UniProtKB/Swiss-Prot annotation:
Keywords: Cell membrane, Disulfide bond, Glycoprotein, Ion transport, Membrane, Potassium, Potassium transport, Signal-anchor, Sodium, Sodium transport, Sodium/potassium transport, Transmembrane, Transmembrane helix, Transport. The keyword Membrane applies. Belongs to the X(+)/potassium ATPases subunit beta family. This is the non-catalytic component of the active enzyme, which catalyzes the hydrolysis of ATP coupled with the exchange of Na(+) and K(+) ions across the plasma membrane. The exact function of the beta-3 subunit is not known. The C-terminal lobe folds into an immunoglobulin-like domain and may mediate cell adhesion properties. Residues 57-278 are extracellular. One of its GO terms (molecular function) is protein-macromolecule adaptor activity. GO terms for cellular component: apical plasma membrane; basolateral plasma membrane; cytoplasm; melanosome; sodium:potassium-exchanging ATPase complex; sperm flagellum. This is Sodium/potassium-transporting ATPase subunit beta-3. It comes from Mus musculus. Widely expressed. The chain crosses the membrane at residues 36-56.
Amino acid sequence: MTKTEKKSFHQSLAEWKLFIYNPSSGEFLGRTSKSWGLILLFYLVFYGFLAALFTFTMWAMLQTLNDEVPKYRDQIPSPGLMVFPKPQTALEYTFSMSEPQTYKKLVEDLESFLKPYSVEEQKNLTSCPDGAPFIQHGPDYRACQFPVSLLEECSGVTDANFGYSKGQPCILVKMNRIIDLIPDGYPQISCLPKEENATIATYPEFGVLDLKYFPYYGKKRHVGYRQPLVAVQVKFDSGLNKKEVTVECHIAGTRNLKNKNERDKFLGRVSFKVTARA
């Protein structure tokens, strides 16, 4: 048995050079220029076809979509509720009346949120008649004014701190927008405290949402739309250094807007906790 001869470094280097380019056959990396050309042509045609197929599929799908109204809306049984300002942790508001920095961010968020509701920002909107849905048929859709004065003590006009410095904080509650929704009745957002150490005031009175703000026609069609708001002001009983209360709000006053569902306990309702320290 003879041992396999070990190639020298120069022999291995020469073979690699020959593999990279063979001057006698004109091959580069083992293929002729014609072979490389055919392979590149194949992949160019193959991936070009895939790109064209993907583009056509996307185009065909987009033709079925309406740019102004969602195609599928039957799975939204009833709107939910949202609160503002955004809580620091999981629907809990905690602050100290004697420490402005603890509620400074909440006040700033409320100011920013209510800025589009100022008189100046709404001067080009329509003063709509109360008590009835504002039905429109386009192509131009007008948006109704929502006077911030309806929020009374929570408007930021009479109290720049929205009640936080006095231990009577304001929380804004709004109903999620659903295109073309018209409430069957007179919608309102009803809020009650779970504990007996506080009372709740709502603005507008009884948390009423005027029908003139319905229906909503979508972001692109209904430019300038102002969503109706309900302000909830928590008023604690005096005499306690630490005051806590959980507030539950739900949609009421209509037959088609639900607030109970075994599968979705948050449908048409929201609850939040307020903790105020001296």
